[in-house]
Amino acid sequence: MSFLALYLASIGFSGTQIGVLLAIVPLIGFLVQPLWGVLSDVNHIHKQVLVFACFGVFVSMIGYASTEDFTLLLFFTILHAIMRAPIGLIGTALALEFLEQNDSKDSFGSLRLWGSIGFAIAVFGIGAFLVDDAIWWIFPIYAVCNFALGLVALSVPKAEVHGEVLWREGLSLLFRERVLAYFLVGVFLIGITLGIVNNYLAVYLVDISGAGWVIGVALAISALTEVPLMARVPVFIKRWGIRLVLVAGVAVLPVRWLLYAFIDNPLLVLPIQVLHSIAMTSLLVVAILYVDRLLVPKLRASGQSLYTAALQGIGPSIGLFAAGIIYQRAGIDLVWLLCAVAALAGTLVIGFVVYRYPAKPEMQKTIS
């Protein structure tokens, strides 16, 4: 929820309290997602779990909207984190199953594009009409959307999530596959900064006197420019090679954070948002391909889970908690400066790993 930090600040919570509430979501999600996976796989109830999770998010958001007490919000935040954890994974599996049944599996990119368009419309509308005077309404809106999603999920076909995640075996990879371990260190450092920007961008824009519509446009730009770039990944890799595409995409992040630290005109933030799309294309497509070719097939699901944990679980959780404390004591500029340092370190680590241990020759054939 891109506006949650802004809402929590508006009701008077301290930076530390905000950091705790924000950090819980990726951390809990990381911890419970394997449990959801086991429940779904063993009982073959992926669709039922998706429906239940959507309705669970609905309940948690109704609770969130009904109180400003920190302890109660902590409870509803944990509930929300637990319930939202399986939605992305199972939703993707169901979508792919539907497309495969209709001989349209290559159309998955189009579905993702519609998701980005929906997100762009939502964040622009919230930014333009709710942020300035009625930000509380993000919770009822989010709740209703998840309730509707649960109803829609009742009608979609069943699907199996293929690729067993062996967590014990996966963790042992960090000791056996040193290349993967080094790579994940860099990804972890990058993940710290991404968790912060996903939650504090709205706070930052308000701090530099940005209007609600500017916040909405900034978030919409990030979403709308992401998918077209992802669709061009095979072309980029064929022309420049996977190493350059991966490292160059990640390298824009320290530049982005540094620019944030020194910009005080909210309109100048808008063109910088394109850098987000470049980086996410690298991290959500190219880096995944790189990790996939480091491992034998039976360990790829576990390797990808470790990658996701570093980028979207442990990294963001630590970053969000630290950002709350730093923001309270020193303001948002120092947050961005430290993000620049972390992202630069992460970029250097990733660059060293991918150039020291280049992709296997067969990888290029697979990508092409």
Where are these regions (language model features)?
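Helix-loop boundary and gating motifs at the non-cytosolic
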Residues: M1-P26, V179-A218
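Structural signature of the two symmetry-related core transmembrane helices
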Residues: Q48-I62, A143, L244-L259
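A membrane-interface helix-boundary motif in multi-pass transporters
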Residues: A128-V144, I325-A343
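Juxtamembrane intracellular "pre-TM" segments in multi-pass secondary transporters
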Residues: S155-V187
